[in-house]
Amino acid sequence: MFYSENYDVIVIGGGHAGTEAALAPARMGLKTLLLTHNIDTLGQMSCNPAIGGIGKGHLVKEIDAMGGLMATAADQAGIQFRTLNSSKGPAVRATRAQADRVLYRQAVKVALENQPNLDIFQQEATDILIEQDRVTGVATRMGLKFKTKSVILTAGTFLGGKIHIGLDNYTGGRAGDPASIALADRLRDLNLRVARLKTGTPPRLDARTINFDILAKQHGDAQLPVFSFMGSVDQHPRQIPCFITHTNEQTHEVIRNNLDRSPMYTGVIEGIGPRYCPSIEDKVMRFADRNSHQIYLEPEGLTSQEIYPNGISTSLPFDVQMKIVNSMVGLEKTRIVKPGYAIEYDFFDPRDLKPTLETKAIKGLFFAGQINGTTGYEEAASQGLLAGINAGLFVQEKESWFPRRDQAYMGVLVDDLCTLGTKEPYRVFTSRAEYRLLLREDNADSRLTPIAHELGLIDENRWARFNQKMENIERERQRLRNIWIHPRSEHLDVINEVLSSPLVREASGEDLLRRPEINYQILTALDLFKPAMDDKEAVEQVEIAVKYQGYIEHQQEEIEKQKRHENTAIPDNFDYTLVAGLSNEVRAKLEQHRPVSIGQASRISGVTPAAISILLVNLKKQGMLKRGE
């Protein structure tokens, strides 16, 4: 039986990828359907209750700059906000929010249910209808079929999902939710490469049984950051602290003594887990010299008694999990309310996708999220947004769009996946981007909002606010360029008081702002350079643009230069162990493959463009580059 209405785009799955994938074409004016097995779990945070972090916060800002939901939901649900790397350069500063699971889910559900052009239907999708290598519809468990021109699959860990606790296992998409077995079987019949990955989650603890009095507190920032360019601090709910404890030798002994009951160490689990979010078993075995590991006790919400112990993801049996928890300071009498577990699931080789996230084999079929081999809410959401945009463009027979590596972290993510593929869950880091000074959190809107407006993704309020900010930036920079101070000026004494060395030649306001001891606040407190702007976002961009102007221009030149290094030779005896800045993973692959050129090195799976930039710098230092390279 076919449903009475046809849809332009159908999205399967209502997680972080599915949410953004459904909203994007709907905002573009296309009739969109979101199919989910449970409307009440839309936007569910399946693992850690947090949004953002290093690299991930950049993705959230980019999603927001293009009209996406994640940043707004985080602002409405964040119960502890922090700016990570705040003492470092602007390229690596990142926003992170501890989130209330219930508030986050509510924010997502409200946005979806009130989005024009978007319908939501609760049914498990069991088949994707295909004719002559083109998508034509979706079939559901109850036999109902929907006609469509495009399908976006965002099934997360649900495809063939298998949950492991100790040596026991059962099918499931996550704890409490069924796996998508029929759809997984159907997809395995398609001309797409499929494999298995694994991820895990820690046990949840009863806050009433934790001795917080003897634990260190971790508060959020005094000056709360905001995720959305349209957001404000007033949207944030009440802020609360996290707490810190540590594993110890007793904890590690419990783990070592029970590895024969671990599904990972007995070969029961075959899927590869995330390198940068290892289980506590892996931490203890891989870092045998460490006597302890820091564990963050993160509240799951303002009205919840559940605590998320960040750092002890495990699939060991429940009785072992209890011993692990009770071995730590402050948790001696703590009860577990939900056991930790590992989950294996199907993922598809992202090298079978176009950079638009459309499959190469089937027209109109797009993949987004964990089924492409990524890990993390933010990575999933950014893929969902990109797939949603391109599904919308596809049904309108318009030219596709995807960001370049020098344009967005979304571009880095998609290029890495579609070009290199992955054999382990992939997450974004700032170190993966070779042009990260151009890809800051603060300028995500200037990079992407004009494109979003052209694509029809943002409303006129956001567009007007963006243009006002851009005008404020340009007006203020022009004002500072036009104000000059001379060595014989009457204002000289006052200005010299804030300078590390006296002024000996004329300087503009921008010249002074470039000096390391001067910031915008100090400069505009001086009578000559008053008044300061009220637009704090514009102030931040003015200061960064002025102080880092030379570096920014250099990176823009590097973008053009990078294209010329395809045939740059690497000596046979080149010693990669002497190259500072390469990760152990990249160094091992270069040693193994011994590439003969930069071009060849760049195509080795796992060797990032950032690593190529480091190699080029070292080759230049050693006089191995020809003039002009």
Swiss-Prot record:
Keywords: Cytoplasm, FAD, Flavoprotein, NAD, tRNA processing
GO terms for biological process, alphabetical: tRNA methylation; tRNA wobble uridine modification
Subcellular location: Cytoplasm
Protein residues bound to NAD(+): 273-287
A UniProt-annotated Pfam family: GIDA_C_1st
GO CC terms, sorted: cytosol
GO MF term list: flavin adenine dinucleotide binding
Keyword Iron: no
Requisite cofactors: FAD
UniProt binding sites for FAD: G13, G14, G15, H16, A17, G18
Family: Belongs to the MnmG family.
Function according to Swiss-Prot or TrEMBL: NAD-binding protein involved in the addition of a carboxymethylaminomethyl (cmnm) group at the wobble position (U34) of certain tRNAs, forming tRNA-cmnm(5)s(2)U34.
Subunit structure and binding partners: Homodimer. Heterotetramer of two MnmE and two MnmG subunits.
UniProt protein name: tRNA uridine 5-carboxymethylaminomethyl modification enzyme MnmG
Organism: Mannheimia succiniciproducens (strain KCTC 0769BP / MBEL55E)
